[in-house]
From Swiss-Prot:
Record carries keyword Ribonucleoprotein: no
Matches recorded under CDD domains: HDc
UniProt family annotation: Belongs to the dGTPase family. Type 2 subfamily.
Organism: Aliivibrio fischeri (strain MJ11) (Vibrio fischeri)
SMART domains per UniProt: HDc (SM00471)
Top-level division of the source organism's lineage: Bacteria
This protein's UniProt keywords: Hydrolase
Gene Ontology molecular function: any one: dGTPase activity
Family matches, as PANTHER family: DEOXYGUANOSINETRIPHOSPHATE TRIPHOSPHOHYDROLASE-LIKE PROTEIN 2, DEOXYNUCLEOSIDE TRIPHOSPHATE TRIPHOSPHOHYDROLASE
HD domain span: 67-260
Pfam family, one: HD
Upper classification of the organism: Bacteria, Pseudomonadati, Pseudomonadota, Gammaproteobacteria, Vibrionales
Name of the protein in question: Deoxyguanosinetriphosphate triphosphohydrolase-like protein
Protein's GO biological process: dGTP catabolic process
Length: 448
């Protein structure tokens, strides 16, 4: 079945975990408009302006994107996808009701990423290895539902469907972790990032939130939703969940497009990649990707990207984004011989056409090879990794002496209640900007 029957959604997807009695005179906004406002006005969102996307704040070139501008671009692409899907497949309009919902999900999707990008994530995962681990998507859910002080206990108290849209991996970290853990190091400077990339999922500390999000689903849907993509290739390979909601699938495509195309633009402007590298690794493959438009226009696009003229480069970037965005359609999430989801939010996902999915993978691989794994970028990431681990080690040595007052109180409460006190330290560090972490490191370790 490739077309839906009449779509009806449970009103419980607009519920919040805590019933609010807010003093808001004549507030006519929808649930999701209020969610968007809460995210935009949050301190956690503002901090993204000083967190690493690819090129860290303080780079010699100020053209680069930060986590904040990346999130804004993901939001722009995500709402563009929703708009074109409503026109292309009007039978799904009841499922794609709110632009504000997609904006909220896209704006919030990276809010849990720590300072120094993946270096910070690996560092916190290593330091939390015996205390539940650390992972950026799991931290995002934690900030939205518990940490951001919009409410006393429930974070931003967002609607259930918004949280479902942010939930990229609906399983606990210990369920998807490799069966064999890497060997610990005697000196953190010898830590290899490839060994300590975290699995993707939710913390056990936040089981109550995951259970609340999934409450409207049937037991059959809950079981199917948490199935894995593939069997583990080896004892050292993490597993990944297979399914996500339709809103999350749109956000994830928008995120991938922003990463594969807009981060490419940064690299071109900053001289990190050359025309020859592009031609060999990307253009030659896109010329044979199976998409007629790309095959006919890739040479012109390449000329524009490397013309040295900003307006030409922007036009080339826009052409690629548009080609990808307009190749997205809604399809069933399961194959014909598999059981279907009962919930409409899970039964359907957004997918790129096969040829354009291949094209996007080529672009992402290029950015990964020539930008992310560029030796200069890796040195910066390594430095951030060391900063985060040393800060964690110091704070954990004497939390009552070194933590700020609010975090100190939370640490004491966790200790007294038998909860995970190490999570409080990880939460504090994860919320830091790159600059704040650097200054705290200097306070702790640089001689006066």
């Amino acid at each position: 079945m490739n077309k839906p029957n009449e779509i009806t959604l449970s009103p419980h997807w607009e519920d919040r975990i805590s019933n609010e009695q807010k003093l808001r005179r004549n507030d006519q906004r929808s649930v999701f408009q209020r969610d968007r406002a809460r995210i935009l006005h949050s301190a956690a969102f503002r901090r993204l302006q000083a967190k690493t996307q690819v090129h860290g704040p303080g780079s010699a070139n100020d053209f680069y994107r930060t986590r904040l501008t990346h999130s804004l671009e993901v939001s722009q692409i995500g709402t563009g996808v929703v708009a074109q899907l409503k026109l292309r497949q009007p039978e799904f309009r009841a499922l794609l009701t709110s632009t504000s919902l997609m904006e909220s999900i896209c704006l919030a999707h990276d809010i849990g990423h720590p300072p120094f990008g993946h270096g910070g994530e690996i560092a916190l995962n290593y330091m939390m290895r015996d205390h539940g681990g650390f992972e950026g998507n799991g931290q995002t859910l934690r900030i939205l539902s518990k940490l951001e002080p919009y409410t006393e206990h429930f974070g931003m108290n967002l609607a259930r469907r918004t949280l479902l849209g942010v939930l990229k991996y609906p399983a606990f970290l210990d369920q998807v972790h490799s069966t064999e853990r890497p060997q610990e190091v005697s000196n953190v400077r010898h830590l290899k990032s490839i060994d300590w990339h975290p699995p993707k999922g939710v913390y056990r500390d936040d089981a109550d939130i995951l259970n609340w999000i999934l409450k409207p689903l049937s037991d059959v849907d809950k079981a199917l939703f948490s199935t894995f993509r593939f069997q583990q290739e080896s004892q050292h390979t993490h597993r990944k969940t297979r399914f996500k909601s339709i809103d999350c699938s749109i956000m994830e495509l928008a995120d991938d497009i922003a990463y594969g195309v807009h981060d490419l633009e940064d690299a071109i402007v900053m001289g990190i990649v050359t025309r020859n590298q592009w031609q060999e690794s990307v253009a030659s493959k896109l010329a044979e990707c199976g998409d007629e438009w790309f095959e006919a226009n890739i040479e012109t696009i390449s000329d524009k990207l490397f013309s040295g003229l900003q307006y030409q480069r922007k036009d080339g970037i826009g052409s690629i984004v548009n080609a990808l965005l307009t190749s997205i359609t809604i399809k069933p999430t399961t194959f014909n011989d598999e059981p279907e989801f009962e919930s409409e939010l899970l039964r359907w996902n957004a997918f790129l056409s096969p040829s354009m999915s291949y094209a996007l993978e080529v672009l992402k691989k290029f950015v990964g090879q020539f930008v992310i794994h560029n030796s200069e970028m890796q040195r910066i990431e390594y430095k951030g990794q060391q900063i985060v681990m040393e800060i964690f080690d110091a704070l954990n040595s004497d939390p009552e002496r070194l933590l700020p007052e609010n975090d100190k109180r939370e640490w004491r409460e966790a200790k007294e209640s038998g909860a995970n006190a190490h999570r409080v330290i990880a939460d504090y560090i994860a919320g830091m900007t790159d600059g704040y972490a650097q200054r705290l490191y200097n306070q702790l370790f640089v001689p006066i």
